[in-house]
Amino acid sequence: MVQAKLHLTTVHEGRQFVGESGSGHAVVMDDAHGDTGAKPIELALLALGGCTAFDVIGILRKMRQRVTGYDVELQAEQQTEPPTVFTRVTIRHKLRGCVQPEALKKAIQLSETKYCSVSAMIGKTAKIETTFEIIPEEEAPAPGEATRASR
């Protein structure tokens, strides 16, 4: 079993915390009344986006798909009564490059059902819907690859 160990330190009268990950990276968090950091619930949604994005891009690379840009947009609805858990999340994947739609569908599906632990957790309370858009680009050599004309 993998264990996670993190640390939070109060910074501003208990209204702001700096969290430190086990790898030593810091993130600033604020409560619902402040504006000096991300709210914890926002970080949960960002974690979902990051988790699925890393999965999808890694799977697409293994499939030899050429991705030149990738954005993930997330929207969520929450319960009105505490705990205000997510009840619905929409993830929109926007990729640029030479990517086959079926490869992207497969990568998203694998992330959702097999690899993304954040998706598995949030999916316990929320319906997660995904959409995608591919913005095609002319097939060009990857950085560092020589073209026939330059050989």
State where each predicted segment sits.
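Extended beta-strand/beta-hairpin segments
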Residues: 1-46, 57-151
